[in-house]
Amino acid sequence: MIVEVPGQYNPKNVEDEVREFWHREDTYHKVRRLRSGGRRFFFVDGPPYTTGRIHLGTAWNKVIKDSILRYMSMRGYDLKDRAGWDMHGLPIEVKVEEHLGFRSKRDIESYGVDRFIEQCKSFALRQKDEMTEQFKSLGVWLDWDNPYMTLKNEYIEAAWWTLKRAHERGLLERGLRVVNWCPRCQTAIADSEVEYWDESDPSIYVKFPVEGEDNTYIVIWTTTPWTIPANVAVAVHKDFMYSKVRAWRRDGTYEILIMATDLIENVLKQGRYVDYEILESMRGEDLLSLTYKNPLQDLVPAQRDIVHRVHLADFVTAENTGIVHIAPGHGLEDYELGLEKRLPIFCPVGEDGRYTSEAGKKYEGKYVRDANPEVVEDLMERGALLASGELVHRYGHCWRCKTPIIFIATRQWFIGISELRDQMLKEIERVSWYPDWAGSARFKDWISNARDWCISRQRYWGIPLPIWICRSCGAMDVIGTAAELEARAGRPVEDLHRPAVDDVRLRCSCGGAMERVPDVFDVWFDSAVASWATLNFPRDEEEFRVWWPADFITEGHDQTRGWFYSQLGASMVAFGRAPYKSVLMHGFTLDEQGRKMSKSIGNVVHPEDVVERYGADTLRFYVLSSNAPWEDLHFSWEGAMNVNRMLNILWNAYRFPLPYMVLDRFDISKADTSKYDLRPEDRWIISRVNSLAKEIEENMSGYMLHRATRSLQEFVLEDLSRWYIQLVRPRTWIETEDPDKLAAYATLYNVMSTLVKLMAPFTPFLAESIYQNLVRGLDPSAPESVHMCDWPGYREDLIDKGLEESMSYVREISEAAANARQKGGRKLRWPVSRIIIASDEQLDLRDLLHVLRTQTNSKEVIILPPGEKPEMNLEISVVQKKIGPVFKGESRDVVEALTSMNPKEVKRIIESGEPLEWKGRSYMITEEMVEFREIPPANLIPAEFSKGTVYVDVSLTDELRAEGYAREIIRRIQDMRKDLDLKVDEMIRVSVALNSNEVVDLVSGWRDYISSEVRATLLRIGNDLDLEGELTKDWEVDGVKIRVSVARA
């Protein structure tokens, strides 16, 4: 049976009790078993890295997922909802290196790769367990007992199988490419793993001496002096105009410089030349015959064997000098041009970011970025430095260790994504994107520029590339499964990680031994295969056939170039189609000012801090309702507080009828609203809750969680708490088992039982708590959990839009009447004789007049016919500029007449065309000579609403005063009942002493009403009473002093 609940919503207590209930009853698994056999809904959890505690962004991400999955479950769907964990890669390695105090790969090798791998595995598993508990504390339901983990052998097989598929399709190749390189981690990193921020770097103009022409130089500009030792060519644009310029220095000497014509002034200013003349101009293509020398060739012996030429390139821009320094070993565009022109791919830099012996003895062993000043000095000593300075620009850094990246040419493994680009663009058109522009614009743009995917990494903790190469003949095999590997190796392989898999040798068809390449997969390849790996494919082909592809995924907008992209690329390789049907892209979490959360700024908000202060349901509802999912969330403590306040109001609305229901032994047999003659307000709230369900369904179909939750919030605050509860409250105080009271109980029960089901996906704890008491308390045969209930849906036959519209006008009129009362100095507790409603439209409020009377506390509600107004007073003002020219010297008399007469009489005279008679003279007054303004009588106070004006009659009679004082006394006694913490049905004895005999006489006639309202067995009212009681308080109302004493009867 139902029980009363505490007066204040305590989220910690509620959520702890619900967690214990879910755990004790194994509710999650019961829900999943209940829905098994329903229509399938395959969700793939974008796996977070197991590197630390969750942050506000990951909390928001999981709340979005959980809310959608809970909703789909209540709609009857059979969910595939395995939690996912990304447990490989640099994110884990760097954390473990920090823990062990390692600074480089050399430290790992010395420590032992096997021991390092075990440390990584232990760290990843330990963090997974901690993060699981954090997500659970938010009420997130996923299959936590059976998550997919990228470190498991069965998951690794999915990646291996996919790479073998790439090999079979001719999409896997190995080659020398320029890649983003982290010299600390000593591995290639993906474009999406490069983080950019502003940094200061050298900005230098360098002169390359032209061969065969004395004192003539090609001028280039660069921010990477360390790449000059690797320069092999320069590039110009075929359509740009270039010039040979004789430029004079202050000492009278000159040089001949070659640069873009439009940039001469700026370049010479940088070099502090004092004058110049253009010797000749030509197009870029006319420079192709020139050759030059690298100014550092005496320090870099390899440069002496390179013929340095000028080449054409479309990527050259009309900036700096209009000529680009080309180092194919250190630039993406440089590399592409190098392949096209068959230039040497000269890269004298090792994996640790230090110059190799190819850079010459002077530079060998030096870290390239540290060598910038030395290279600049060497250029200056050789007369090759035209100008130098500093430039602040955006520069890329390793996403994990924050080291500035460099570009170097290394041998890597690639998947030919560029060959699949057109197919990928077609596939994304089949996907439903939320919002649409996430796919049609942002993702489409990214795919349109897709390059081949560098899948290899020179690290340890990752999925090993399943590529074995014969040491004898160079043949290559790609292994697709553990079973295939064991069959080829002739022995079991228990762990597919390094170093165990490194020791596996295969027999080549030539008789030689095949060894595995040492690289591991790019960690993005791990999560790229999630949609089939989570189905245990390729081991379980039937599960894959039944469920794949995913019905829904959602992640932040950075995953446009991350997980959304890697999944699509891998799936196109493996299956030739997109791995997902619908994608919701959500935003980032920022602070209230729109700044990224950062420890250095001190603006980080931890989800556990919000939960500690306001509870998990508040955090959930706040992040869902604050803005559209695809917009960035600007976290506000005030916003979270307002949501908490809303949940408090919901709790009070739920709590309100409980004492009365308990007292009256209300049971489920009385909860059928069809048994009662419902009032219009009952039918209205039932209509509203059905309209609410309809709105939520429409919004959830487009993943507009913000609209769904805002509709709930508006219903709770406006419809339920501020309106219906106020309308129904007096009916719950009726002593007898009155049908009208039971109708109110039944309506409240049905509305609340529907509301908690609508709230369940978003505030699962509070919804469960209310459901267990209110619904299960009345009906033990109801489903065991609110999350085992079917989605309530809506009944069109119960939605009455006409009634909803009429009630909205009633609410507007009530608010306008309250505003008029305030202007007229009449408190709402004091009754008024009448309100008058004037509108140009026909308002059908007949069925709601009783609501208007009670909510405006008026004895009569008058609705005037359309266009009519109450009888008004008229004010008149003369238009002097119209009177003067007509009446000239008599104008003063005319104005005196108009302002002295009754304005209504003046108006009658003008409308009738009669002359105005004044002091024996007649004057013809026309309409333009006066202006009339209608004003209500002093007792009628107007206030506007959307359809017209409400007039409140604030005149007082003794009867109205008597009722007003009676209501004031009732309110004080009710407050004192709360102070004494009395139960609803406890009777009291009351004494009321007033210092006004007039008010004593007025109130005495309301003695029975006051006693009934406050449940008093004895009520004494007088002027000079001897007061005794448990609690006595003094009050003052409109100058009348009141002393009230209350005691239990």
From Swiss-Prot:
The keyword Metal-binding applies. One of its GO terms (molecular function) is aminoacyl-tRNA deacylase activity. It holds the Pfam family Anticodon_1. GO terms for cellular component: cytoplasm. It catalyses: tRNA(Ile) + L-isoleucine + ATP = L-isoleucyl-tRNA(Ile) + AMP + diphosphate. Keywords: Aminoacyl-tRNA synthetase, ATP-binding, Cytoplasm, Ligase, Metal-binding, Nucleotide-binding, Protein biosynthesis, Zinc. Belongs to the class-I aminoacyl-tRNA synthetase family. IleS type 2 subfamily. This is Isoleucine--tRNA ligase. It comes from Methanothrix thermoacetophila (strain DSM 6194 / JCM 14653 / NBRC 101360 / PT) (Methanosaeta thermophila).
